[in-house]
């Protein structure tokens, strides 16, 4: 299931704002930048660099896995702008570990 349009960070201005103002939490595969957006609903962006995941098919699969986990855990109403960035190479067999990694890392984001 895809993220609803209102829950996506789409403009460069919004993404740059999160990188400037957001707090960073690191996991073993990914890091998350996020801050309180005062909107009442959360918006997300997923960045998977080709440096770490070379095939576009795999990059898209990772983005789908991450977005499905966000929708499944119903984190859409908490009021955060959040960017999830992959920063280490991931082999195909380890994509499922991303779900757990995302859950654990999201819980570490401090409320501000």
Residue ranges and their predicted role:
Residues 1-112:
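Positively charged, solvent-exposed patches that mediate nucleic-acid binding
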